[in-house]
Structure formats: C-alpha cells, structure tokens
C-alpha cells in the first residue's frame, strides 16, 4: 500500500545512507574472514596465527607450524542461547604441523627428521548476530568502538608553560601500536633529550650513536657547511654558496670578476644583490673576522705536516684558534651553518653534552637506563637495542603508524616496513629541530587525523593475540622439557589461555557493554557509539576540556550534538549518518567532487587529514539544472575556517545537510531552530522512549525514521522479490522468485516472529506482521514491524493535541497536565516483562525440592500453583505471591524423644525443611506469560516439564507442516506450466482401497494438480522426456522436504534431551511476568526538542481546555518552558503538526462524503504539490487511491529533514490550506466553566514520548525490612528494600521546632536502638505508649571508632543524679 507523505526537503540527496550497522558487522566479518577462499589474506584471525607461529623450541630441534583454521557451526541458535543463558559461539579448529629436525652438531645445519600434521580443537569463538551484537551468557552485549590516539608521530610544544623563562619547548613522540614509545624533547638550553618508554632522559645523540653513527656522521646529516678562506694578508673570505643567503652588511666593497661594484661597504646585502652575485659567478668575498668567532667547526682540522689534530669538529672558533690555523699553514676550514632563521646549534650543543664516545658504550648506556638491575655485556646490549625498534616481535608500528609517520615526515620510501628505521629517527629529529628554530605550529592531538577508531574486529584480534603469546610460552617450555619425537601436536597445544582471555574480554571489559535495548533507536546508536574511555584510552578524571570539545575536524564524522550530559560528556560520542571507518581506522565522510564550478556525480570519501587542503561548499549551495554553482561566491570550509570562496575555487561539496549529525539528532525535525544544549537532550531522550502498546509514527518527521527502522534489525525485511505464502501473528513464509535465495528450501523462507520477548531493559519486544497471504513483495519491503516501529518507520511516541498555557499551577516548572482520555484509551500504556529465576540445588543436607507441599503455607497461597509447585500460565500475581514452591533441608538439630517418635512413624515427612519459595517482589503486579523448566540431562522429568515439551513439539510439528505445504505449493506452481493440459499415461490411485484420483488419458488441470500428491506424478505421463524432467524436479523436492524434516527432528531432539545446568543444580525454573504500566502522575515525558517534564495531574476529559468545536486538548504545557530554552523547533513542529492533522481529516471527510474521485485526486495533488506524488496518484486505481486517502485520517505524515526542512512561510501556507489561523493560535474554552480564556493560545499537534523513568519503578514504601550490620540502621534504596534517611538537615529542622521527643524517637527506636525497637513493639502490643529509649547503635560505632584511635571511652552515671521519672510521652496534669 502506497503511503502518501509530504516531502519538504528541497535538496535532492542522491547517495543513500550506508547501512547503519555495517560498522560492527563488516569489522567482525573481516576479522573472521567469512566466506573467503584459501589462501586467506594476512589480516584478522589469519594474521594473529601467522604472527605467533611457527613456534620453535629453544634448541631449534623442532618447530610447530600453523597451516589453517576452520570455524564450525554453532551448537545452539541465538534464541536457544538467550533462553538457556548460553554464549552464542562456534568451535574453531586449527591444522598444525609439527616438524622434528636432526641438527648436525658441527655445522649446526638442520635436516627434517619427521613431520606430523593434525587437526586440533582450539576452543570456541563468540559469533556476532546479524544485528551486530554478541550473546554472552544469555544476554545481548555490544562491543563499543574505541576512539584512541593513532600510532605514528606527534609534534607538540608546551606553549611556554613549563619553564620559568616562558620559552616554548618543543617535543616529539613516536607511538607504535606495540612496543617502546620514543620521546624527543628540548630543554630551556636547547639541548635535545630522548626518553625511551618514559624512562630517565638522556642526550638524543646517545641514541644516534647507538644506531651506529659517529660524531661526524651526525654533524654531516643535520648541518650544511660554510667554507672560509684564510688569506696571507690576514683577511678572511667566505666561499660564496648561493643556497646559504647571508643578510649581512658588506664589510668591504664587493666586486664581480670584471671589477664592477656589486655592493658598497656598509650597505646591506639584499636578496636582489644576492641574485646579482650569483649571476656574476662570484667565488668568494671578504667578511668581518668577528662574525666567524663563535661559529663551530664542521670537521676536524689536522696539521698536514705533523698529523696532529689542531681542533675537533663541533669545537667553537676563537681568535686564538684562527691564529693557530694561520701558524700551521691552514688556508681553508669549514663551519656548521647555524646562522639561518631556521637553523641553530642545538644538535651540536647536544653532542658536546654527550660524553659517550662509541656505539658499544651508547648501547650499554641505553641498556642501563631501561634495565637498571642487570649489568650488560656488549653482545647483550647490542641485541637488546636491536630488539627495541628493529625487531617485528617486539616493535610494531602497524600499517596505520607507518602511514601516519610517512605522511608527517613526507617520506614514502618504507611504505610496508612495520618497524622503525634509522632514517625515520633522523628525519623526526630533523623536523623537530626545524619546527623549534622556525617556531612552527605543533600538531593538534584532538584533530581526527590523529585519532583513530578501533573497531570490534581489531579489539578481539588484540585479545586473541595476547592469548596466543601466553600459549606460545607454554608450548616452548613443553617442547624443551618433553621428548618431542614421541608427542603429537595436540599434546603441546592448550587453548585455555586464549579462551580465558576472550571470556574476560566479552564478559568484563569496559568496552563490552550490556546492550541498551530500550527501543530500536537506542540499539542502533549503542552500536554506532565511539568511546575515548577503556583500556589504552583516557580516564574520566584525566580528560581535559580540549579532548571533550567539538573540533573542526568532527564535521561529517562525529556528531557535535549527541553525547551524554554527565562526567562522560565529549568522551562518548556518536558517528554521523554518512560516516565510514577506513582500513586504517580513520573516520571518513563523503563529498561530491566539484570541477570549475560544476558539481559532478563523483563521490569520494576523505579522512580528516586529507580534507585540510580542500575548499568544501555546503550541501545547500544553489545549483542550476546543469550542476553549476549559481552564486559567484559560496560559503565554504577550508583549512578549518568558514570562508566565502569564488565558485571556481570550490573543490568539493557536502552530499547532504544531515551529514554532520548522528541518526538521533537527524530524527529531530526543525533541529536548526533549537539550541544545541536542548538538541543534545532531545537526541538523548529519544533513546529512552518506552515502546508503547500501540505506537504511532510522527506526523512531523525527518525521513530518517524509515532508515533507522530498516537497519535496526528489529523489522523483518524481504530479502528479494516474492510472494507471501503464509502469514499469522507468529510466522511469515515467503516464496522468493530468485532461485539462488535459499535453494535448499526451494526458495521458500520461514520467518518466526518475536512474541513477548524480554529486552535487556525488561521491555516487551514483539513483532507484528504487516503483510497478508498472497501479497506480492519487493526486495527490502517490511514484512513485520518491530517494537516502536509502525508501517516500517520508527514510532517512539504519540501525536497529541497540545496547548501552551498555564493551568492552575499544574504545569509549574515543566510539569505536564494531561487528559484522562490518554490514560483511558491506553495511549501511553506499555508492557514490561520481568524474569524471575529459581534453582534447586544439591546441598550437603540433601537436595532442595520444587514442590507444592510447603510447610506452614495456606491453600489460598497455593491456589495458582500446579501439582509440581510451579505457577500456571495466565495467573494474575501480586507482591508476596508464590511463583515456584521450593523447600530446602534445614540443619539437623538434636531431636527430642517426641520428635524421634514422629520421625519413626512418619519417616522423612517430618524432617526439618524451610520454605525458600520464589515470591513476587514488591512493586510488581502482572500476569504470568511464560514458564520454562530446565532439567538436568540425566534427571527425572516432572509432569510440568513433559507438558511444556509436548506443547513445544506440537508447535514444531505445525511449523514443519506449514513449511512443507509452502514448498509443495511452490513446486506445483513450477510443474504446472510443463504439464498443464497434458494427458496421463496411467491411472493414479489414492490411499484407500480402489480409490482413483485420476483416470488414464485424463488431462491435467490446475484443480486436478491441487488434489494430487506430487509423488504420484513420477512416470505418470506418456512423454519420456516429460517424465524425466518431472522425476528430476521431484527428486529436488524430496531433498528439500528431507532437509526440513532433518532440521525439525534435530529441534525436537533438543527439546526432549534435557539441559546443561551448572554443577550442583538439579532443576531451574524461569517465570516471566508481563506488567502493564499505564501513564501515571510522576511519569517523565518529553518531546524531541529537549522539552521534558513530569506528569503532575491527570485531568478528566471534560475539565480540559477545549476548542470551539468541543474537542478537548490532550496535553497542556507551560509556555515559559520555550523562550529561555530557545528550542523554537517545538513550536514549528506544533504548527506543522496541526496543519497536517487537519488536512488529513479534511481529505478523509471528502472520501466519506463521497466526493467525485477526480476532484478528490485534484485536491490531494494540490495539498502535496509534488510531481512524484502526482504521478503516483495518477497510477493508482480508484479503490487503492481511496484507501490511501483514508489512511490519512489521523494526519498527513510530513518529512522535514534537518537543515533542509520547511521554512516559516511554508508552515504558514499549510496552516492556511487547512483553514487554520496563520499564527497557530486558537481560542480555547475552560472545560470547568465553559468560558473562553482571555487570550488566544498556541495550539497544535506535538509528538510526545513516554520515557524510561516510570514512577511505578521508582516509588516504594517500607515498614520493617533489612538493617545494616554495623550501624543497625535501615538500608537505603529500592533494591535493598530500604527506608528514608533522616539526615543532618532534618535533625536541624526538628531542633529548630524544639520537637525534642519527636527527635529522640526518630534517632533511637525508629532508627538504630536495637533493644528500644523490641521494647517499643512489646509496649504497642500491650497498649502502653511510653517511650523508653536506649543507646543508639551508631553511638557504639562512634565509641569503637574512638577506641581504634587509641582513646578509651567509658560511660559513667554521675552519683546522686537520678533519671527523671515520666509516666508517658506527655506528663499528665
């Protein structure tokens, strides 16, 4: 059925939103490498195994090699795992090869002695469901993606905050994925230090020397050289080098080779003059001798006659040193070029600080810093240093780290190298010194180019690798201790360390979270969440403001709106609608390519660092029909700023206005009119909306509702084109046209619908079929709606008629006044399912028993239990009702002679047992909807178990018959065209004696084929070819039927075989109770714009304000909640919703009044004003059209996408079309008096949600209950059945009133005076109302605290002072 919807969006978005769960599902698929043929690429699980294997023993006499792995089929399906509390996992088997070598003791060469290959069971691996979740111990969990600092290189400075001189100190850090961190930093004296793994710092040149560089090599790499010439006449000339510009004052006249003056003495050498000097071929010119003093030698100066070193490289030049050169006949010397704007002597100064002469000593020094306890030998130190950065086993940059390092250092030679090369370290130091000398900008660590996402596949891969490394140690030890020649591979491999780590990660890791299953939206957003917390991430306390803030690089990647409000603000964020994560883990967003002002259809995805140089136009930039940008100047983003750019400069364009927000924010209509803080609350509160009994799509939507519903996994979607064979409330069977879809079932697929399924948050999740038998469906069409989904679109709340006005103070401070009609009609009623579990164990005193025979319990309490002591389905229960009767043996006491006699007469019946039955906890009142009984495999089954098993088997039998019937129908349809009208070559007999189904020579008709069993057609025709074709088709049919029977036989077997219960458990019973929660005073409700409030009063319908036509409003909100909050979107929604409702009702009235079909068509077209809708209307036949219009009875569904929605003028137009006031205000009348209110009131239709903060779940009362062990005061909180705390402020209030007796009562007998409590009870029973207070227990606690400080406190009663005698609480006069 075509749903007529009004689209207000003007921008045509060609690119569909990528599937919302792809992030999780694709990542785990890539990890498992599902469906790929061998040899597998070295990534995911394959790369983990390859990184650890082969494993050799210490003597290299044997080696264990990995061949391949296979993942088997899971033992239980998802539904069974949830019901039985199991993990949805599959077994993994690995094939390994053990090679044993003979080693020649002289040459140490190895020859293969023996090879053993074996398949080994390697534990299990949790599988991801198609919804992107994991089922761990029966609960659905989500692995949240982690946002982490990317491996690579980061350059930073301290902004002058570290040293007192306020000097800006630069530093750089090389971060690997695995291995030692390397930090370089300058101190205030410009000495460069290095830290390895944040240990004690040392001069950076020690590291360079350890790499094998000498002092001269270091100077040659970091510095250019200048050459000076010493003349015989005492002058110093500088050898002209065009690349080293000197902005000096000329010391003498500088002449060219033809004695033409280039620059006069005392004049400044400019760049123009420098170019003239270069052009003239000048070789050298005289310089001021004082400018040479203080420079540093580039090379050692050696006296050629004696071989003596006159001066070492890096030595500072002095006047004396120059005189020494002249005396020794040295005519030229080179110095380090340290005088430029971007060069300094810091590396030379560091070399002077560094007193270590050789590579060996440098390696030993590094070893001492990192391993202070053990003294090194040169060999150990060299091997240790080599392993630090050059060994794959200890150091891994990862492809991401290498990519970022190469990108930052602008060096792409070692694109595949995963370790750190010497060149990387040298280039990093070179860039760091350049940044320091030129005061260059530091990297922004909060830029998304420097933060990457670790997806679920990578997180599990890391855990698997850690487990394998632990296992590797154990294998090596086993190979060395035992005689390997006699062993098989399975003797060496124990997969337990891997299994333990996986179990810990999925069960307790900070990133493995209990799925938020409040509604379909909360499920999807939880899977798209990014967390900066978790192992290897930030902590709440340490994270500063910068890392939490919205960054310019977040645009189109991370939503600036959706984040929690508490201490996690900015640390937990959401992906935007179109964002994708690339292979390196960087978030990408799509853009359309723009060339010469023309927008092309080419789409590219860019990460944040690639986007920096682009000029990007917004999605709402005006374009003509040819795709050219209309405006000469357009608003663009470039280099982190918003600019006006000429259209020819634009290189890219956004693809959609909603690309910058997450799906939660994209569901808020008129988001552009809301303040960001309120939009944040709105997007967060939609995730808390409770699925209602009958949900309703919003009249004012954004178009995102359908995407969320389809991708959430809560709906059932058609996987191809086909026809519905069977549909009821529990099951839909579809026959697909594509023969490749489910070929084993003959293209027929059965979908079982969820009914009364308990979600993680205890809500009732169910699916409703939205198709009928015989209906033709297209691929992607919705077959069944899920929870909070209606007609294939998200439906979290209800459309209510709202009035913004004060009403007797009942909407003070965001309170909400609501009509009783809403409660009466179950508009906001939701169903919650509570699960209760009880186990009968084998105790030391004997087994516990689930029974109806419970001591000291009256028959009335047992009335709803069956003969086995288990509650019957359908029973209405309230607090303290028994759900399952259970007795537990008590400890045997010394028996009296009478008890011994009773025991002798009645046997075991008289033994001591206590009642440990499962009872309904306080605050729960509902109906039992399901009971599951789990028995030990070998244990006896009671009648209830057998009854449940019989019911489940009968259910499976009927499902099997339905399935077979649908496949048979499909096969008959395939055969009919071949045999229609063909004559039978034989008589077909029925089962009964002499029963004839079809005579020989009779022609086949569709009716006859329907009445014949398919088997009877085999060889029944005269044509041999036809018989062969039919035989072949029937053999396929037989295979399909047998396959289905095998599946259902296996399911029936599982029902009757018993269960795997934990050790010591005999029987387990689970009871599900459905609780109906109607809207009540105290429930929290909210709109989509952050406008939230609590229901303060439910008013009778007749007292509510009403319109002139007598229809009352549903809800009254406070108008003061709008201006200060600045969420004007709610007013726009209210007005548009009113117009949509009125227009829908008017069109429906026209149908009911029998208006001519043609004029009705024209009217509908004029309302929608859309060529696409007009074409759809013209294509419909009259009946379909009428039905489509009648569906608009409750209102026209409108789509107003974020940042591209309906403007004010369009809302006014729609109000005018509906015949409503253009300002959206109406005269309302007081329901109590019938008089009109003084002013006109803003009214309309708003979408209101009921949130998961229900008063019934929060409120509780206590008379007596549990007390704290130490203080003897009542516990706190509903979960502990605690009481109210009377704190300091309450005591002050009572003191201020002088209510001393009341205060004494509160602080003693009503709280923690144990003996006083008992006495008070006794006195109340006797009718003596006299308060006799003793010492409160908390006073004793205080005394003990003081004693623990060494102060002995004793209490004395003073002599002669007697206690005052009183006869009652009030002295009698």
Curated annotation (Swiss-Prot):
Pfam families noted in UniProt: RNA_pol_Rpb2_1, RNA_pol_Rpb2_2, RNA_pol_Rpb2_3, RNA_pol_Rpb2_45, RNA_pol_Rpb2_6, RNA_pol_Rpb2_7
MF GO annotations: DNA binding; DNA-directed RNA polymerase activity; ribonucleoside binding
Source superkingdom: Bacteria
EC number: 2.7.7.6
CC annotations in GO: DNA-directed RNA polymerase complex
Catalyzed chemical reaction(s): RNA(n) + a ribonucleoside 5'-triphosphate = RNA(n+1) + diphosphate
Disulfide links within the chain: none
Gene Ontology BP, a term: DNA-templated transcription
Keywords assigned by UniProt, alphabetized: DNA-directed RNA polymerase, Nucleotidyltransferase, Transcription, Transferase
SUPFAM superfamilies per the UniProt record, alphabetical: beta and beta-prime subunits of DNA dependent RNA-polymerase (SSF64484)
Function: DNA-dependent RNA polymerase catalyzes the transcription of DNA into RNA using the four ribonucleoside triphosphates as substrates.
PANTHER family assigned: DNA-DIRECTED RNA POLYMERASE I SUBUNIT 2 (PTHR20856)
Family note: Belongs to the RNA polymerase beta chain family.
Subunit organization: The RNAP catalytic core consists of 2 alpha, 1 beta, 1 beta' and 1 omega subunit. When a sigma factor is associated with the core the holoenzyme is formed, which can initiate transcription.
Protein name per its UniProtKB record: DNA-directed RNA polymerase subunit beta
The species this protein was found in: Lawsonia intracellularis (strain PHE/MN1-00)
Gene: rpoB
């Amino acid at each position: 059925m075509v749903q007529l919807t009004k689209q207000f969006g003007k921008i045509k978005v060609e690119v569909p939103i990528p599937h919302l769960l792809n992030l999780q599902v694709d990542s785990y698929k890539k990890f498992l490498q599902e469906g790929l043929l061998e040899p597998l690429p070295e990534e995911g699980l394959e790369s983990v195994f390859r990184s650890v294997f082969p494993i050799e023993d210490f003597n290299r006499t044997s080696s264990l090699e990995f061949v391949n792995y296979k993942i088997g089929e899971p033992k239980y399906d998802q539904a069974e795992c949830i019901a039985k509390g199991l993990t949805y996992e599959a077994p993994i088997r690995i094939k390994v090869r053990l090679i044993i070598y003979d080693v020649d003791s002289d040459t140490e060469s190895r020859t293969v002695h023996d090879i053993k290959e074996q398949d080994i069971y390697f534990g299990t691996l949790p599988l991801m469901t198609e919804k992107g979740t994991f089922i761990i111990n029966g609960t659905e969990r989500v692995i949240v993606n982690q946002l982490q600092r990317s491996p690579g290189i980061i350059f930073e400075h301290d902004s002058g905050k570290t040293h007192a001189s306020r000097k800006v100190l630069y530093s750089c850090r090389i971060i690997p994925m695995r291995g030692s961190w390397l930090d370089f930093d300058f101190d205030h004296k410009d000495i460069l230090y290095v830290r390895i793994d944040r240990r004690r710092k040392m001069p950076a040149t020690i590291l360079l020397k350890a790499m094998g560089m000498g002092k001269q090599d270091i100077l040659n790499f970091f510095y250019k050289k200048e050459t000076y010439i010493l003349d015989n006449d005492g002058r110093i000339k500088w050898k002209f080098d065009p690349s080293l510009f000197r902005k000096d004052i000329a010391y003498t006249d500088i002449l060219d080779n033809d004695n033409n003056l280039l620059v006069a003495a005392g004049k400044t050498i400019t760049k123009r003059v420098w170019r003239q000097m270069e052009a003239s071929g000048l070789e050298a010119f005289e310089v001021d001798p004082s400018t040479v003093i203080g420079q540093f030698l580039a090379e050692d100066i050696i006296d050629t006659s004696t071989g003596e070193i006159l001066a070492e490289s890096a030595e500072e030049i002095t006047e004396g040193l120059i005189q020494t050169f002249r005396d020794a006949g040295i005519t030229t010397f080179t110095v380090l070029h340290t005088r430029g704007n971007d060069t300094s002597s810091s590396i030379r100064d560091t070399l002077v600080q560094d007193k270590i002469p050789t590579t060996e000593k440098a390696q030993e020094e590094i070893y001492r810093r990192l391993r202070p306890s053990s003294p090194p030998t040169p060999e150990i130190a060299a091997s240790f240093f080599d392993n630090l950065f050059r060994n794959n086993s200890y150091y891994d940059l990862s492809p991401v780290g290498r990519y970022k390092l190469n990108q930052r250092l602008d060096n792409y030679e070692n694109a595949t190298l995963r370790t750190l090369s010497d060149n990387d370290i040298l280039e990093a130091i070179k860039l760091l010194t350049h940044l320091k000398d030129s005061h260059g900008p530091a990297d922004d660590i909060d830029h998304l180019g420097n933060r990457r996402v670790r997806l679920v596949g990578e997180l599990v891969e890391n855990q698997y690798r850690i487990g394998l490394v632990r296992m590797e140690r154990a294998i090596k030890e086993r190979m060395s201790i035992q005689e390997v020649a006699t062993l098989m591979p399975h003797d060496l491999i124990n997969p337990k360390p891997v299994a333990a780590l996986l179990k810990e990660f999925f069960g307790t890791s900070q990133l493995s979270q209990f799925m938020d299953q409040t509604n379909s939206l909360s499920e999807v957003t939880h899977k798209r969440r990014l967390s900066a917390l978790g192992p290897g991430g930030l902590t709440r306390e340490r994270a500063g403001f910068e890392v939490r803030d919205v960054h310019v690089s977040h645009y189109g990647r991370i939503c600036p709106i959706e984040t929690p409000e508490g201490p996690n603000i900015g640390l937990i964020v959401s992906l935007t609608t179109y964002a994708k994560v690339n292979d390196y883990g960087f978030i990408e967003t799509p853009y359309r390519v723009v060339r010469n002002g023309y927008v092309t259809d080419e789409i590219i995805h860019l990460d944040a660092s690639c986007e920096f140089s682009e000029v990007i136009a917004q999605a709402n930039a005006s374009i003509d029909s040819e795709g050219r940008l209309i405006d000469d100047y357009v608003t663009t983003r470039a280099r982190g700023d918003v600019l006006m750019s000429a259209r020819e400069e634009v290189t890219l364009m956004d693809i959609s206005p909603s690309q910058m927000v997450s799906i939660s924010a994209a569901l808020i209509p008129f988001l552009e009119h809301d303040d960001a803080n309120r939009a944040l609350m709105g997007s967060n509160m939609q995730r808390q909306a409770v699925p209602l009994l009958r949900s309703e799509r919003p009249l004012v939507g954004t178009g995102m509702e359908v995407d969320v519903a389809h991708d959430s996994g809560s709906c059932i979607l058609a996987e191809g084109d086909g026809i519905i064979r069977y549909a009821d409330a529990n099951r839909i069977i579809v026959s697909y046209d594509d023969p490749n879809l489910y070929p084993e079932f003959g293209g027929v697929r059965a979908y079982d619908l969820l009914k009364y399924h308990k979600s993680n948050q205890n809500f009732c999740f169910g699916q409703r079929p939205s198709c009928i038998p015989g209906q033709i469906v297209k691929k992607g069409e919705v077959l069944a709606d899920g929870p909070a989904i209606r007609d294939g679109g998200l439906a979290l709340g209800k459309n209510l008629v709202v009035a913004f006005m004060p009403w007797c103070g009942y909407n003070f401070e965001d309170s909400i006044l609501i009509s009783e009609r809403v409660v009466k009609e179950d508009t906001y009623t939701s169903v919650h399912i509570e699960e209760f579990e009880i186990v009968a164990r084998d105790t030391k005193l004997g087994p516990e028993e689930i029974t109806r025979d419970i001591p000291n319990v009256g028959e009335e309490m047992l009335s709803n239990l069956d003969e086995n002591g288990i509650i019957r389905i359908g029973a209405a229960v309230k607090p303290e009702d028994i759900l399952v009767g259970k007795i537990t043996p008590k400890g045997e006491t010394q028996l009296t002679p009478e008890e011994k006699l009773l025991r002798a007469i009645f046997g075991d019946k008289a033994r001591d047992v206590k009642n440990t039955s499962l009872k309904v906890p306080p605050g729960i009142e509902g109906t039992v909807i399901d009971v599951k009984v789990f028995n030990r495999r070998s244990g006896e089954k009671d009648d209830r178990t057998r009854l449940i098993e019989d019911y489940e088997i009968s259910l499976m039998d009927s499902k099997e018959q339905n399935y077979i019937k649908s496949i048979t129908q499909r096969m008959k349809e395939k055969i009919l065209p071949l045999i229609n009208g063909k004559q039978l070559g034989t008589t077909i007999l029925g089962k009964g004696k002499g029963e004839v189904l079809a005579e020989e020579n009779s022609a086949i008709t569709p009716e006859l084929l329907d009445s014949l069993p398919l088997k009877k057609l085999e060889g029944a025709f005269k044509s041999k070819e036809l018989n062969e074709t039919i035989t072949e088709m029937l053999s396929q049919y037989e295979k399909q039927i047998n396959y289905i029977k095998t599946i259902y036989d296996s399911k029936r077997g599982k029902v009757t075989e018993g269960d795997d219960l934990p050790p010591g458990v005999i029987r387990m019973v689970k009871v599900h109770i459905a609780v109906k929660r109607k809207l009540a005073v105290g429930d929290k409700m909210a709109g989509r714009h952050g406008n939230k409030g609590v229901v303060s009063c439910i008013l009778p319908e007749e007292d509510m304000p009403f319109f002139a036509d007598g229809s009352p409003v549903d809800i009254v909100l406070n108008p003061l909640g709008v201006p200060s909050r600045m969420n004007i979107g709610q007013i726009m929604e209210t007005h548009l919703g009113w117009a949509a409702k009125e227009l829908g009702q008017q069109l429906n009235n026209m149908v009911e009044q029998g208006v001519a079909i043609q004029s009705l068509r024209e009217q509908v077209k004029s309302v929608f004003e859309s060529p696409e809708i007009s074409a759809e209307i013209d294509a419909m036949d009259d009946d379909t059209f009428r039905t489509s219009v009648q569906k608009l009875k409750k209102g026209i569904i409108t789509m107003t996408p974020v940042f591209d929605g309906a403007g004010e003028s369009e809302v006014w137009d729609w109000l005018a079309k509906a015949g409503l006031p253009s300002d959206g205000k109406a005269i309302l009348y007081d329901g109590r008096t019938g008089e009109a209110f003084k002013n006109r009131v803003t009214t309309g239709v708003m979408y209101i949600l009921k949130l998961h903060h229900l008063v019934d779940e929060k409120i509780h009362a206590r008379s007596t209950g549990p007390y704290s062990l130490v203080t003897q005061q009542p516990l706190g909180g509903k979960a502990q059945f605690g009481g109210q705390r009377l704190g300091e402020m309450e005591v002050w209030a009572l003191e201020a009133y002088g209510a001393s007796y009341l205060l004494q009562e509160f602080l003693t007998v009503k709280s923690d005076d144990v003996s006083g409590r008992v006495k008070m009870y006794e006195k109340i029973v006797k009718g003596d109302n006299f308060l006799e207070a003793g010492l409160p227990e908390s006073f004793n606690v205080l005394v003990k605290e003081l004693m623990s400080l060494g102060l002995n406190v004793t209490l004395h009663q003073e002599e002669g002072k007697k206690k005052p005698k009183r006869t009652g609480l009030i002295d009698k006069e």
